[in-house]
Structures are given as C-alpha cells and as structure tokens.
Regions:
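C-terminal region/appendage detector
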Residues: 1-178
Length: 178
C-alpha cells in the first residue's frame, strides 16, 4: 500500500486513523495495531468506531447513529463521544437485501434484465431512484409519480411504487417473504 506504485509515501512518516465496525472484537483491534506498528512501523495509530466518527462529523458527541451498509445494519447509541456497547443493536438486513427486494418488485412489474450484471443494474437503480417514504401507507393510496431510469443498453424503464416499497424493508423486516 505504501509503495512507490501506490501511495508514493513512507508508512513511517504518517500516523494512521483506522475505523472499525461496531462490536469488533478486541482481538481484531489488537491484531490490526500489531500489523500497523510492527509491519508498517507507523508512528501513531488511532482506532475508532465508524459510528462515533459519523456522529462527530455532524458536530455532535451524543446521539444515535443508524449505520446501514451492504450486509448489516447497526443502531449505535453514543454518549459524550463513547459508544454504549451493551446497547448496540444489529440486524442482518441492509442494502443488499433492499437491492434483492427491488429486483423482486421489478420482476413482478415485468422487468428482467437478462444480464450477468443484473444485480449491479438493480443496485444502481436503487441508489438513484429509491427513496424512503414518510408515510408509505398514504403513498400506497396515491398515484405515485413514476421515475424514468436509463439502463446501460440505452433503453428506459419506469419505476413506480417500487421506489419506496423496496427501502421500506429496512423498517419492516416482516416484508421478507411476502
């Protein structure tokens, strides 16, 4: 990583900030520190939980961070800059599940992409067209505006209620299997 081909710098000259996931075992943290100090000879290392740094970025030190990645979602309560590990909640529903749910909805609407990159296309649609509804029950009764999405092959598809139905999975895991 620190070679002339990559960062073009020397690890001995630069302190490192390493982020870690909530509930990361102490053993993993110790092993990472060992590698950075003994292999890369870094002068300093600061390890912090991603959620704490996210909260700091908002200018706050107390709050609850909802951190949803590709495979897991954490709710992390933080008080005066310190995560409260016994109160951290984890659920194995996250972005990948929303993408799968959106793919299911799109298939029900007649869209099947017949491509080896189908999942990447659906993920891109999710990232560009989906949104969280403030009141999904109300939006279900309304004639929601359809969004046009341009596919990589130049064709377009129209996405309606699937735009807010798929992300609702994050708040209603019971939707899995419906």
């Amino acid at each position: 990583v620190y070679s002339k081909d990559q960062l073009q710098t020397f690890s001995e000259e630069h302190p490192v900030l390493l982020t870690e996931a909530p509930l990361n075992p102490r053993k993993n943290r110790e092993r990472a520190a060992e590698v950075f100090f003994e292999t890369f000879n870094v002068p300093a290392l600061f390890i912090s939980m991603q959620a704490v740094l996210s909260l700091y970025a908002t200018g706050r030190t107390t709050g609850v961070v909802l951190d949803s990645g590709d495979g897991v979602t954490h709710a992390v309560p933080i008080y005066e800059g310190f995560a409260m590990p016994h109160s951290i909640m984890r659920i194995d529903i996250a972005g990948r599940d929303v993408s799968r749910f959106l793919r299911l909805y799109l298939r029900k609407e007649g869209y099947d992409f017949h491509s080896s990159s189908e999942f990447e296309i659906v993920k891109a649609i999710k990232e560009r067209a989906c949104y969280l509804s403030i009141n999904p029950q109300k939006d279900e009764t309304l004639e929601t505006e359809k969004a046009q999405y341009y596919l990589p092959d130049g064709s377009t598809i129209e996405i309606g209620p699937s735009r807010f139905r798929a992300p609702e999975l994050l708040f209603r895991p019971d939707l899995i299997g419906e």
